[in-house]
Amino acid sequence: MSEFDNAIPTAFDPFAEANAEDSGAGTKDYVHVRVQQRNGRKSLTTVQGLKKDYSYNKILKDLKKEFCCNGTVVQDPELGQVIQLQGDQRKNVSSFLVQAGIVKKENIKIHGF
């Protein structure tokens, strides 16, 4: 029986490496810009993944003034601080973050529709 025990492979988890918290040189910190459909034609844009060094409230204030929309900063238990803006502001937010020098263009991921 011991010969067969050695021949049987152990359980392999293909997602173990993806779930591991590694801070290697290959990992990038992406900023995710998403749009969520609310009721009717209303939508909500969320910005997640900004560095903690930045003041979220100051960025929100500039975004609201630039795009003439309302917004708030929400504390999420899993995602941390998330900026929410009214309306579909995906392209506006991504161009604003690049022009302000907050994020590089290749580090922005736009999700939605």
Curated annotation (Swiss-Prot):
Gene Ontology MF term list: translation initiation factor activity
Function recorded in the entry: Probably involved in translation.
UniProt xrefs under SUPFAM superfamilies: eIF1-like
Protein name as annotated: Protein translation factor SUI1 homolog
Record has Protein biosynthesis as a keyword: yes
Stated family: Belongs to the SUI1 family.
Alphabetical list of PANTHER family matching this protein: EUKARYOTIC TRANSLATION INITIATION FACTOR SUI1 (PTHR10388)
Keyword Lipid metabolism set for record: no
GO biological process: regulation of translation
Transmembrane segments: none
Alphabetized UniProt keyword annotations: Protein biosynthesis, Translation regulation
Gene3D superfamilies: SUI1-like domain (3.30.780.10)
